[in-house]
Amino acid sequence: MNFVFLWAALGGAIGSSLRYFVGKMMPSKFLMFESFPLGTFSVNIIGCFVIGFMGHLATKKVFGDDFGIFFVTGVLGGFTTFSSYGLDTLKLLQKSQYIEAISYVLGTNLLGLIGVAIGWFLAKNFVGVH
């Protein structure tokens, strides 16, 4: 039996638990901001650093595919998908695909925000949860 899905699921459970823990440990006041999503901000930045580090090691075959699936797809995927976004963008830039990288960054942020707004609107107006 192929355990790839189990490795990803186990890593995802660990990453999600870590995300929850970090989010609970962070204060809501940050610098000059009265209310700032510091937990989410922190996991996104930490995740980007870790996936950059691990992504480089993966290209050098420092660890096997199963560990990569467990840690990168599972743990970091559960911790933050923003780290994958950062790695994908870096890979485009490294290949001098600047238009693609800019389109990816702008498109992800703009369409992501639009998606959140539409989802919010639909839940508020059609599901009856105000």
Curated annotation (Swiss-Prot):
Could you give a GO molecular-function term held by this entry? Answer: metal ion binding
A single GO BP term for this record reads: cellular detoxification of fluoride
**Top-level taxon of origin:** Bacteria
Is Zinc-finger tagged as a keyword?
Answer: no
- Report the catalytic activity: fluoride(in) = fluoride(out)
An annotated GO cellular component: plasma membrane
Keyword annotations of the record: Cell inner membrane, Cell membrane, Ion channel, Ion transport, Membrane, Metal-binding, Sodium, Transmembrane, Transmembrane helix, Transport
Q: Give TM segment ranges.
A: 3-23, 38-58, 67-87, 102-122
Q: Where in the cell is it found?
A: Cell inner membrane
Q: How does it sit in the membrane?
A: Multi-pass membrane protein
**What does the entry report regarding how activity is regulated?**
Na(+) is not transported, but it plays an essential structural role and its presence is essential for fluoride channel function.
Give the binding site residues for Na(+): 77, 80
One Pfam family matching this protein: CRCB
Give the protein's biological function: Fluoride-specific ion channel. Important for reducing fluoride concentration in the cell, thus reducing its toxicity.
What PANTHER family has UniProt attached to this entry? FLUORIDE EXPORT PROTEIN 1-RELATED, FLUORIDE-SPECIFIC ION CHANNEL FLUC
The entry sums up its family as follows:
Belongs to the fluoride channel Fluc/FEX (TC 1.A.43) family.
Q: What is this protein called?
A: Fluoride-specific ion channel FluC
Q: Which organism is it from?
A: Helicobacter pylori (strain G27)
Gene behind this protein: fluC
